[in-house]
C-alpha cells in the first residue's frame, strides 16, 4: 500500500479537474476511469478519461492528507487576484487566474502552501495569521509531464520533481 497522497487529475474529454486523496494511486485512478467494474470512482468523474497531473505526499497520516485536500479544494470557491499579489511580489513574476481549470488549481495550490499552518493533524489556511505558523517538515509534489509547475515559487518545505512518461 502507498502512503496517503493528495492528487490532481484532469479529464482528457473536458479539461475539468478533480482533487482527491488516496493511499493507492493506481486503484484510485482506475476507479475514476471506470476500469474496475465493482467501483465507480467519484460521481463527478464518471464517464470521462482522467490523467494525473500531480501527487502530493509527505503527510503524517490520513487525517493530515484529507485536511490538505479539503483546504485546497475550498479555495476554488472564491478566487481573486488579490490572493496572488504577495506571491507575485516574492517571485518577481506575474501570476493570475485565467480560464484554464488546471492552471487555476495549481494557483490555488501555490497560494495554499504559502499560507498554511499545521495544527495537530490539520492543515489550516492562515493567510491572516490567526494561528501560530507551524509548517510541515517536508511535502513532495510529484509532477507528471508539466515541467512549468516546478518553476513556480514553492515554499522551502515543498520539494518538486518530474515524472516523465516517455
From Swiss-Prot:
It holds the Pfam family GIY-YIG. InterPro entries: GIY-YIG_endonuc, GIY-YIG_endonuc_sf, SLX1_endonuclease. PROSITE patterns: GIY_YIG. Coiled coil: none annotated. Residues 2-82 form the GIY-YIG domain. Residues 23-43 are annotated as: Disordered. This is Uncharacterized protein L300.
Amino acid at each position: 500500500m502507498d502512503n496517503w497522497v493528495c492528487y490532481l487529475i484532469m479529464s482528457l474529454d473536458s479539461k475539468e479537474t478533480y482533487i482527491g486523496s488516496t493511499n493507492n494511486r493506481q486503484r484510485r485512478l482506475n476507479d475514476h476511469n471506470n476500469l474496475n467494474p465493482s467501483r465507480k470512482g467519484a460521481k463527478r468523474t464518471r464517464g470521462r478519461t482522467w490523467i494525473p497531473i500531480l501527487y502530493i505526499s509527505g503527510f503524517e497520516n490520513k487525517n493530515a492528507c484529507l485536511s490538505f485536500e479539503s483546504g485546497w479544494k475550498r479555495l476554488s470557491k472564491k478566487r481573486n487576484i488579490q490572493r496572488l499579489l504577495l506571491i507575485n511580489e516574492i517571485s518577481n513574476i506575474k501570476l493570475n487566474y485565467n480560464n484554464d481549470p488546471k492552471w487555476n488549481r495549481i494557483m490555488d495550490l501555490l497560494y495554499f502552501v504559502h499560507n498554511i499552518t499545521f495544527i495537530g493533524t490539520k492543515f489550516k489556511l492562515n493567510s491572516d495569521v490567526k494561528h501560530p505558523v507551524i509548517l510541515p517538515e517536508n511535502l513532495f509534489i510529484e509532477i507528471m509531464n508539466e515541467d512549468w509547475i516546478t518553476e513556480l515559487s514553492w515554499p522551502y518545505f515543498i520539494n518538486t520533481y518530474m515524472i516523465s512518461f516517455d
